[in-house]
Design a protein with these regions (language model features):
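Glycine-rich NAD(P) Rossmann-fold beta1-alpha1 loop
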Residues: 18
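N-terminal Rossmann-fold NAD(P) dinucleotide-binding loop
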Residues: 21-22
């Protein structure tokens, strides 16, 4: 890839406007890196359910200057309990005891996190209803063809387009998904059911 003197890619394409794509777009813009984003959806809409931001995620978001915006509308977690299918407790963590050293963990709706990230990347050019149909690595650049027929040359192409990534398939060929053995159920419940901010 061809890089400018400061070592940062000169022109970056981010494919996918989810959590990772928007976080990266905002971060690159703040560093003065020219980037643009394409998103398959025709328009932004609330997607997903509840999400937990652990202390590691909050540390990363704090480095991006976004922690305060998230904390104002989220539920701090005081404890977390893990149980098996028979309701037997496997583990319990008192998160409140860890906050002085590691910071807070938050529970919030995924769309609330997405909105904060979208606001942080508001100055990045975004092309909605657009996908990538071909990628060609030319050594010193990457040639990209888009679903609307447009073409572009980029120093770096980043696939942040999710589980069924078109970028991954174009770059590495089709690889079937492999079940990890884990299943996660997510839901949204009324705030009064959380036991005063508890996670268990």
């Amino acid at each position: 890839m061809t890089n400018p003197p400061n070592g940062c890619p000169g022109k970056v394409l981010i494919v996918g406007g989810g959590i990772a794509g928007l976080a990266l777009a905002g971060a690159l813009h703040r560093q003065g890196v020219a980037c643009q984003l394409v998103e398959r959806a025709e328009a932004w809409a609330p997607v997903g359910a509840g999400i937990i931001l652990g202390v590691n995620a909050m540390a990363a978001l704090r480095n991006l200057g976004l922690a305060e915006a998230l904390e104002s509308g989220a539920q701090p977690l005081e404890k977390m309990t893990i149980k098996d299918a028979d309701n037997r407790r496997l583990a319990r963590t008192n998160l409140a005891d860890l906050q002085p050293r590691f910071g807070v963990s938050l529970a919030l709706h995924r769309s609330d996190l997405h909105d904060v990230l979208l606001q942080s990347a508001r100055h990045v050019p975004m092309h909605m209803g657009t996908t990538v149909t071909s990628i060609e690595d030319r050594g010193d650049s990457v040639a990209v063809t888009f679903s609307d027929g447009d073409k572009g040359l980029f120093d770096l192409v980043i696939g942040a387009d999710g589980l069924h990534s078109q970028v991954r398939e174009l770059a590495f060929g089709h690889r079937p998904l492999r079940y990890s053995g884990y299943t996660c159920w997510r839901m949204v419940v009324g705030g009064g059911l959380g036991g005063g901010g508890s996670g268990g």
